[in-house]
């Protein structure tokens, strides 16, 4: 059973130097498959380990696990300056995703502009297909988690979350946990109870991004341009930035884990909010 003591034993072993799954298996006296599943669980839950597979697809494939230093966020001056801005940003108005986008190789990025109402996902965005590409982990930066109420072509996004969670995809969310967002948060966390699984974890954090990262495949940011139409249903203009550069994806993941590990769980914060008289 993977408990905190065994997690520490594995992490301490890998911290010294990169290890193969076979070495880890011998160290903890488990078989290769069990060691591999333990490493995968630690990666999903804590983000402090990473894996590289050499000669993938061949009989001689070698899986190496190494320490992912989430403290060392930046690998260049651009990233260092950006992270300093992110650390002090509390709202989406405080930081533009374009400040990241501009540094990414033109062949590994794309952006498009669309007008939409808050809860309607367009075919061009195709959020459903994007989410379904997830094989292991979906990391989400959100504000009030309003997109759990969104719909794409009559298909509810909350149903896609359920689909992913049922496939044992790890879903980690950073969002503001307050009176305005509690219903959205509880709606998403309810899937854990419904499925009798704990694949969804939400933590409170005030941060500037509205984005999600699909495994190591791509990151998509959403930025509001605050342009409204005169129609009854409020329509805004948004810019979507998509990044597929491996180095920048890894950096954004490290930003996520740096914020996530120091943030309080949504469940605990909701309990504290509800402890205030007359709020329940």
Feature-to-residue mapping (PLM):
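Short, cationic-aromatic polyanion-contact patches
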Residues: 1-6, 20, 51-78
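Hydrophobic residues on short alpha-helical segments
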Residues: 7-14
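Short capping segments at the starts of secondary-structure elements
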Residues: 14-23
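Alpha-helical residues within the helix-turn-helix
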Residues: 26, 44
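Short amphipathic alpha-helical interaction segments
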Residues: 30-41
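PLD-like (HKD) phosphodiesterase/transphosphatidyltransferase domain
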Residues: 83-173
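HKD-type phospholipase D/PLD-like phosphodiesterase module
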Residues: 174-215
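HKD (HxKxxxxD) catalytic microenvironment of the phospholipase D
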Residues: 200-248, 256
């Amino acid at each position: 059973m993977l408990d905190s003591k065994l997690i520490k034993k594995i992490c301490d072993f890998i911290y010294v130097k990169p290890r193969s799954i076979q070495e880890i298996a011998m160290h903890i006296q488990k078989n290769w498959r069990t060691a591999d599943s333990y490493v995968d669980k630690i990666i999903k839950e804590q983000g402090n380990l990473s894996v590289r597979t050499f000669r993938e697809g061949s009989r001689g494939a070698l899986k190496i696990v190494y320490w992912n230093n989430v403290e060392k966020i930046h690998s260049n001056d651009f990233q260092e300056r950006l992270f300093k801005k992110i650390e002090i940003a509390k709202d989406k108005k405080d930081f533009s995703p374009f400040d990241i986008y501009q540094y990414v190789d033109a062949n590994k990025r794309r952006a498009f502009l669309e007008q939409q109402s808050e809860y309607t996902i367009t075919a061009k965005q195709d959020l459903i297909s994007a989410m379904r590409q997830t094989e292991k982990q979906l990391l989400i930066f959100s504000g009030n988690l309003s997109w759990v109420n969104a719909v794409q072509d009559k298909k509810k996004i909350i149903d896609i979350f359920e689909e992913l969670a049922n496939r044992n995809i790890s879903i980690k969310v950073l969002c503001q946990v307050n009176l305005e967002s509690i219903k959205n948060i509880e709606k998403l966390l309810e899937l854990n109870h419904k499925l009798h699984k704990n694949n969804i974890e939400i933590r409170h954090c005030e941060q500037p991004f509205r984005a999600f990262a699909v495994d190591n495949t791509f990151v998509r940011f959403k930025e509001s341009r605050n342009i409204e139409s005169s129609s009854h249903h409020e329509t805004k203009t948004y810019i979507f930035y998509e990044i597929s550069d491996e180095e920048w994806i890894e950096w954004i993941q490290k930003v996520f884990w740096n914020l996530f590990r120091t943030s309080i769980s949504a469940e605990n914060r909701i309990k504290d909010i509800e402890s205030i008289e007359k709020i329940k």
